[in-house]
């Protein structure tokens, strides 16, 4: 099997069928309590994919080879799920802010949900435009319920393929599984947001120059298999397992060879999310 080198999404450091019922009724009050998001609006929603590959020389950040594979894979996956996909390439930090501000001002009243995918270099709490960093909190804040009223009560998903630090996970041999205490970034508790990070806080995120990033490969694969069968958090758990068990870095630099990765999901969703209805 041909090996191609893995890279990290950080600044350069050196050169049987089960039926699922989507609601329940309180036996005491007789009030219908819907446990899943309403996904039968006229439109599924927008999926914005920001794919930053080439960076200004002043940033000192290398090109992100393999990211175009991710962008194409995501476009196909979410188009098949009936989302209106908009791909944007090589945006500056100012352009990213302006784009998401503009999208948040659109009328989403006929849309079931919103998805934003960020493919770039990053650090903890930061994503990079082609000319420098921007706070993730600033970008997600445009879609808060008090700012984007037409998405209030609807699921807002942010999928982030980027490094969150410079730690490397060497992995551990096990025959029974391990339990790690992973403390995620403190995020404001606005309801109905979900953040799917490619890696745990403080760690590198790996990307293959030929096949794309481990996380996006796995996410698209699991969505293709299970989007019409499983709830989204269950799908993401399978993504976590796939990344954790099926990938290991290959690098000509011994310090970066044989490393592992685990995605991190931060959910403030208040209902179950199914991509079918």
UniProtKB/Swiss-Prot annotation:
Sequence positions bearing Phosphoserine: 26
Entry annotated with the keyword Endoplasmic reticulum: no
Modified residues (S-nitrosocysteine): 163
Catalytic activity: Strict requirement for an Asp residue at positions P1 and P4. It has a preferred cleavage sequence of Asp-Xaa-Xaa-Asp-|- with a hydrophobic amino-acid residue at P2 and a hydrophilic amino-acid residue at P3, although Val or Ala are also accepted at this position
Transmembrane segments: none
Enzyme Commission numbers on file: 3.4.22.56
Subunit annotation: Heterotetramer that consists of two anti-parallel arranged heterodimers, each one formed by a 17 kDa (p17) and a 12 kDa (p12) subunit. Interacts with BIRC6/bruce.
Entry protein name: Caspase-3
Species in which this protein is naturally found: Felis catus
Protein encoded by which gene: CASP3
């Amino acid at each position: 099997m041909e090996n191609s080198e893995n890279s990290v999404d950080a600044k350069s450091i050196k050169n049987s069928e089960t039926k699922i019922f989507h609601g329940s009724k309180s036996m005491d009050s007789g009030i219908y309590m819907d446990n899943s998001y309403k996904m039968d609006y006229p439109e599924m929603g927008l999926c914005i994919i920001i794919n930053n590959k080439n960076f200004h020389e002043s940033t000192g950040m290398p090109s992100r080879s393999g990211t175009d594979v991710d962008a194409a894979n995501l476009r196909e996956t979410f188009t098949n799920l009936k989302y209106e996909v908009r791909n944007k390439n090589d945006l500056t930090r100012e352009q990213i802010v302006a784009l998401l501000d503009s999208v948040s001002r659109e009328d989403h009243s006929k849309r079931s949900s919103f998805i934003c995918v960020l493919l770039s270099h990053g650090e903890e709490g930061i994503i990079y435009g082609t000319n420098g960093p921007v706070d993730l909190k600033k970008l997600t804040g445009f879609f808060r319920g008090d700012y984007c009223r037409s998405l209030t009560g609807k699921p807002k998903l942010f999928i982030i393929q980027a490094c969150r630090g410079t730690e490397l996970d060497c992995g551990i041999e096990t025959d029974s599984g391990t339990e790690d205490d992973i403390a995620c970034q403190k995020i404001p508790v606005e309801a109905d947001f979900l953040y799917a990070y490619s890696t745990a806080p403080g760690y590198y995120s790996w990307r293959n120059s030929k096949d794309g990033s481990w996380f996006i490969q796995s996410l698209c694969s699991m969505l293709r298999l299970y989007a019409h069968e499983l709830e989204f958090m269950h799908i993401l758990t399978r993504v976590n397992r796939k990344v954790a068990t099926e990938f290991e870095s290959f690098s000509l630099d011994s310090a970066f060879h044989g490393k592992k990765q685990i995605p991190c999901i931060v959910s403030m969703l208040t209902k179950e999310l199914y991509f079918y209805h």
